């Protein structure tokens, strides 16, 4: 049973990485905004498997994103995805205690924290107005959260958003 579950996670991981590669980007103030499907997958990993696997998978996702998209910031996404993997892994501990609204608030705050840390690292030493930074962080967080809600309601009847 454990081997079967492990193989399923590996296959889903490969599928999610392929989907992430082909997600279209849009431009906002000369900055590319790309939906982060990987953080949504980490949310489900944290909800169903816990911290350890979510941290490991977060690091793998992060270093993969670093190598593919931003070699100049090598390690930035690995750091943030690992840290957020720790936070999202907490979901399994409070699965039966927190209400759906509490879980949703926690997940949104984790997404917000993830993008705040990443863009703090990315914009360090670059003159980007704080208002643009806040807008980009907000857009990324809301976009990821909305995709999570749509996926959860459409494909997972007993997922993260259900009581």
Regions found by a protein language model. Give the residues of each.
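Terminal, non-globular segments
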Residues: 1-163
